[in-house]
Amino acid sequence: GDDFGRYTKLEKVTWFDDTNVHKYKNWGKDEFAVKQSFSKNRDAYDDIIAQAASMHGLDKGLVKAIIHTESGFNPRARSGPGAKGLMQLMPATARRFAVTDVYDPAQNIGGGTKYLRFLLKRFNNDLELALAGYNAGEGNVDKYKGIPPFAETQDYVRRVMSRYNKLYGGNTSRLSMN
């Protein structure tokens, strides 16, 4: 109700609606917005992010932008459709990439970065298609031969790219084809 609306505007939370495809609505006024209680986590996972990004030939800033958008740095985040943890892994994706504890930051980030590397290879290093696949599933990117016409996915790609470029030193030349 009204209290929730006031809370979300005051706290600048990212809300994940209960739909089959995540809806990303940032109630904050800027790209840096994160729920206040999790803003302390913004740099808490930097070592894990750097290690996983390096292992999979990714830019750590990109991984951080995805975590920012997916979970707002909340390691216990859970979406309505069932995605969990910092990189919001769905159960099937977690199993596919050998993640046994989605709430363990190292496992979650490790699985999420493996998945992102897989998507980048699959979509010929096209970052926007890889992000769309991360959000809506690679099958939807194949089906629509590009970013799916889902407002949620289009917003997700835009938001991650914006955060990557504005907040986390985005540099697509750091994405290798490893």
Language-model-derived ranges and their functions:
Residues 17-19:
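A short, surface-exposed interaction/processing loop segment used at functional sites
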Residues 1-15:
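N-terminal propeptides/low-complexity segments immediately following signal peptides
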